[in-house]
Amino acid sequence: MFASDGNAATQWMPTGSVTVQVPGKINLYLAVGDCCDNGYHELVTVFHAVSLVDQVTVRNADVLSLGLVGEGANHVPTDEHNIAWRAAELMAEHVGRAPDVSIMIDKSIPVAGGMAGGSADAAAVLVAMNSLWELSLPRRDLCMLAAKLGSDVPFALHGGTALGTGRGEELATVLSRATFHWVLAFADSSLLTPAVYTEFDRLRDVGNPPRLAEPGPVLAALVAADPEQLAPLLGNELQAAAVSLDPALRCALRAGMEAGALAGIVSGSGPTCAFLCASATSAIDVGAQLAGAGVCRTVRVATGPVPGARVVHAPMSRGLNDM
């Protein structure tokens, strides 16, 4: 297919679609600095991508559009208030084109659940448009665009396990060959990240929660591939704020531990709770008991680490149209 804006030379526009699979994340360790003058908090965190994924399909279109299906889709905006929409505009601006694509997101990552589902979708749009438009932008350019969109977007590109600093966008790969087994408990409620940070600042002013130790032991446990070594080291300084805003999380955390998890933690700003298990069999057992305990909306079993945003369906060959 060829197209022209009436002024520029006719250019090639690939047809077809691209689907990108992108994982949610949990924070194995999250230490929060004091609020800076710019309103942000400096972070030290250990990101861990898990096998709960969204699928994002991007096609060429006459105008930019966005649709969603799946987990929490009715609660997500489908206009410029959605970070995936802004990702399409940013990519198009970067390469000097109009953002004429349709985006369809099939969600499994919970909305406002502390697993960076929106950031994951934005990363997926960048990867999909890079492939669909055959731009061949290098990874460093994608990471630069990702950082402009939000603090969690670069890790959604990166995947695996990584140490994040700054606002979370500065990443260093953590090498771990192990597969860790998780049970994820979705809450009935949602928590907005700004509200959690506001509550965190209030609690810190009165000395709660205590600050975490340095993340070195967490990194060592990951390298050792030992879930029992890792379990007591999981920590999240935002957890107290999340629980303060949603006290029902205490019941979920307690139920997961009583079901046999090695450790439980609120993921990021919450309210999703992540439970580390000793094995795949243990994760299934813990998930079944947690699902029957009536303390959460939905339970998912997942593994990590997994890769970041990646194409799972490449564009169709030139000259071929969609069926």
Swiss-Prot record:
A biological-process GO annotation: isopentenyl diphosphate biosynthetic process, methylerythritol 4-phosphate pathway
Function recorded in the entry: Catalyzes the phosphorylation of the position 2 hydroxy group of 4-diphosphocytidyl-2C-methyl-D-erythritol.
UniProt pathway: Isoprenoid biosynthesis; isopentenyl diphosphate biosynthesis via DXP pathway; isopentenyl diphosphate from 1-deoxy-D-xylulose 5-phosphate: step 3/6
Encoding gene per record: ispE
Domain of life, per lineage: Bacteria
Name of the protein in its database record: 4-diphosphocytidyl-2-C-methyl-D-erythritol kinase
GO molecular-function term, one example from the UniProt record: ATP binding
EC category name: transferase
Organism whose genome encodes this protein: Mycobacterium leprae (strain TN)
Keyword Iron-sulfur: no
